[in-house]
Amino acid sequence: MSAATPSTASSTSCTSKSPTPTEAGGTPLRSRFAWCITGSGHFLEESIALAERLPDVDLFLSAAGEEVLEIYKIHLDDLKAGFRVIRDKTASGVPVGMLYDDVYHTVVVAPATSNTVAKCAFGISDSLPSNMFAQAGKLGIPGIVFACDTEPVVVTKSPHDWVTLRPRGIELQNVERLRAIDFCQVVASPAELEAALAARLADLSLAWNTSSS
């Protein structure tokens, strides 16, 4: 079940110090995944389970994404045990600067609401996930978007039951528009998301982890 992404951008509250390529610890350039969570519950648990298997992942939460996590009883404190979590808190897009610092090699938006898909497809970057996606593309950083509304009939899990949705033509058109965006791969299921991530890992000469970063 999707919830709209807020129309006012915010950005940032981070649970730990952000890495930079010049840190004393020697953080390699473009060494991490940036995983953005929007206000969608569509295969949310499955998406997070895949993120947990990747090496070196930071979670970027929109305000709506943070609300939906709680609705689905996925608590921030639990996520912080396995990820660095960056939250939507100010209007200046501070976390996006980590893309300019060459911290991230891949931006994942999963799951992505139809609202976020529309923003990304039309070049609107007024939320943390849509801003991350836009700036990644400008830097030539590959993006993977797990779009929710990709078929005429979509069965999705709400917090209490399974729901059948029928995306409108405009939602389906926006997905196709998004597919044409540079440096963007659109996926439509957890299996496709896993396959896209596996291919990206292979490109980077990396492997799945058995635990989160």
Predicted ranges, named:
Residues 3-6, 14, 19-212:
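A cross-family phosphate/adenosyl-ligand binding-site feature
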